[in-house]
Amino acid sequence: LSEGKAYMEGDIWWMQEGGRVGDFYGFKSAGIFAYDESNAFTDKWEQLTPVFENGVFQYKYLLDGKEYTGNIRQKTLPNGKPFRGGDYNWEEPEGTRDGVIDDNDRMVIGNAMPDVTGGLNTTVTWKNLSLYLGFYYSLGGQIYNAAEHNRNMFKYTGTTPSPEVIHNMWLHPGDQAIYPRPYNDDYNNARMGNSFYLEDASFIRLQNIRVAYDLPENWIKKLMLKNINIYAFV
């Protein structure tokens, strides 16, 4: 690192002295606000639960199932506008919890490096026929699904969100949604480096296949050979 200074590469990769190779850096999502009133927190930034009756807010909040009567704080943009129903509830790292969501709230949200990699192989034999299978595996680590993120940003008129998003996006107050409201505005729910789009990168892959056949001994004796093996390898 130049002069030991941390830096970000490609708006997602984070490099810092003492850090890990492959760190993802961005905003950590804690879900979607179901109501405008869901953006309510204690002074310690514990999220409160708004009380509704017949769809009408009762101007009451619960904390751990009990009525809360203390001070109420909200998360806002740097310009002071509070986040609303359908927006991401962005977490803030220790030391920057002021309720204002800005670039200071980026943090390490995951890592691309696997914990374990390796291979497995086996050979099965039946009479003159044999089958070799070679597997490769990688366990742990994450990938950032930038393709899916870009598809669901609502920034490009020629791009249709995935069916998963269309059926699980926030549309009405109270929706327990997986994806935010379908708008591209200054709340920037489509901001790059969103922990929501981190996915488990673990996999096991059948990498090599070899099918072999040993010609019968009585066939090859006529050719004065010891063995003939015919195989196909993929």
Residue ranges: model-predicted function:
Residues 96, 100, 117, 187-188, ...:
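Core subunits and conserved enzymes of cellular information-processing
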